[in-house]
Amino acid sequence: MQDVVIIGGGAVGCAVARELSRWQLDVCLVEQGEDVCVGTSKANSAIVHAGFDAPVGSLKARFNVEGSRRMEALSRELDFSYRRNGALVLCFEEAGLPHLEELLHRGQVNGVEGLEIVRGEQLRALEPALSEKAVAALYAPTSAIVCPFGMTIALAENAAHNGVTFRFDTRVERIRRTQAGYTLETNRGTMETRAVISAAGVWGDVLHNQVCGDTARIVPRRGEYCLLDKKDGGLVQRTVFQLPGPMGKGVLVTPTVHGNLLVGPTAVDQPQRDRTATTAEGLAYAQDMARKSVPGLPLRDVITSFAGLRAHLAEGEDDFRIGQPVPGYFEALGIESPGLSSAPAIGAYLAEQAAAYLNARQKSDFDPLRRDIVHLRELPFEERQRLAEENPAYGNLSLIHISEPTRRSYIS
């Protein structure tokens, strides 16, 4: 019998796994995909939000702000890409200024540092490529960008290094409470565990409804993105938002940690939990809205497009559900934006709650570091050549110029 089974190998599930690996517990993470980071965590905006948008007193505000504060140190421990580039929320007419003031006040109450409203020459000095129609912006200097798949993989690798086991291609089809804990029926057999932590994304409500007294309903919300060539990566330095609306934070323009520009997302609710196709209409909308912020955006340089799903709770809920709804069953439900930003804090919280429930003791030999990671794209050509001469796997695979992977990178 396991002590804990974590369901879901996205950013939150892997953050939970890494934090639980601090404890003397037998932990297994199960993921229905072939690897970690194959769902929402691989297809999102890659933003570490500052925390000014989340409603005061909400779980989104609490975990966003704490997660943002944890992220930089976590990136150093686990060696994944992180850059504090700041963010701007644009306002295109004077009538929108009260909304900016509201975001400023909300962020200050939430504990976000350094917020200010900028106008005129100050705004243009920050980002010269912005539309001349932008009259003001909320500036959030603590906003950042990460590599979401690099982050999720790093969390998983460190968890595995500290003893967590992983089972892929394993779909939990049914879960039920037992006297000893929980029985999980999967497509690859039955598992017994003392406790469960569900971080199942758009499938989280299905599991919740099998064991909890109330009913939850998740509506998958699809967002479409365009990725631009690296030659355009310097057009903006900061993440550029427009004023948020009822469907989310709207279409953004942001640099990526790899040097590209990213545009999106759209926001379309759908019944399917696995449909991530892009549409001509969706991509056109994202591009049109992005050009409202940055008119000179060279959309001829789009090199790929993609879509991802976020787990939006229906029935008017606008917050995360994080906790222990029934004894021994912990969950992170409805993790949409700012889920990636919140993942380190959610992971720490749920791990501490589960460890307390199981009366676990901390390990004396927990290793927080991920070492010896080679980032080839950041090395000078001579160093790459030396590595390839020492190990031909470093030079055996060549793909398109988006990210310059090699066979050795994949083996690592």
Model-derived features with residue positions:
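Short beta-strand to alpha-helix junction loop
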Residues: 62-65, 93-99, 139-157, 276-281, ...
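Glycine-rich FAD pyrophosphate-binding loop
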Residues: 22-41
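Helical element adjacent to the flavin cofactor pocket in flavoenzyme catalytic cores
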Residues: 142-194
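Dinucleotide-binding Rossmann-like beta1-alpha1 core, especially the glycine-rich loop
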Residues: 46-126, 135, 250-251, 391
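N-terminal Rossmann-like FAD-binding beta1-loop-alpha1 element of flavoenzymes
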Residues: 2-28
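Single conserved hydrophobic/aromatic residue that forms the stacking wall/gate
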Residues: 400-412
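C-terminal catalytic lobe of FAD-dependent flavoproteins
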Residues: 257-258, 274-382, 387-396
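Flavin-dependent oxidoreductases
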Residues: 15, 175-180, 184-264, 268-277, ...
